[in-house]
A protein has these predicted regions:
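DNA target-recognition domains and sequence-specific DNA-contacting regions of bacterial/archaeal
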Residues: 1-110
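Amphipathic alpha-helical coiled-coil/heptad-repeat segments
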Residues: 91, 106-149
Length: 149
């Protein structure tokens, strides 16, 4: 139950396992991403923030891209990996940084079935329950704000 990444640097492919991270520097040609993916903010004030994208976009040099090599519920992966990413950010008090080198070393447990295959159904169920909790939290925050409690 391990999540490892494919990290593609401008020079070499570092073999890891489930995701690819494409580096798009200012000197390289633009990469158009049309697959469902996760992205993370590589530097700056929001460094380590991860986003689920299911639309086409051009990542810039401040955006790391994780494209799945196997079928995963990326919303579930996002929910699992976000707390880990914040802990990996370098120089949090200054200009935070989280580059491909740090991402390549991050490990996340992935549920597997009795045959050792990635269990997409349990990812979907976990994320569904997580999403319900997020909605309850938002509703409570709205009530508290409405009544200034």
């Amino acid at each position: 139950m391990l999540l490892i990444f494919w990290c593609i640097s401008p020079i070499v492919l570092i073999p890891l396992l489930i995701f690819s991270s494409e580096k798009n520097s200012k000197n390289s040609k633009k990469v158009y991403v049309s697959e469902e993916c996760l992205t993370w903010t590589k530097d700056g004030a929001k460094c380590g923030t991860i986003f689920h994208r299911d639309y086409e976009f051009y990542p810039n040099d401040h955006c790391g891209v994780l494209i799945p090599k196997v079928e995963l519920n990326l919303k579930w992966v996002r929910q699992q990996i976000q707390p880990i990413l914040y802990n990996q950010v370098i120089a949090k008090d200054a200009q935070g940084m989280l580059y491909e080198e740090q991402m390549a070393n991050i490990e996340v447990d992935i549920p597997v079935d009795d045959n050792g295959e990635i269990d997409l159904a349990i990812q979907n169920k976990i994320y569904s329950e997580y999403y319900k909790l997020i909605q309850i939290k938002k509703n409570l925050e709205n009530i508290l704000e409405k009544y200034s409690i």
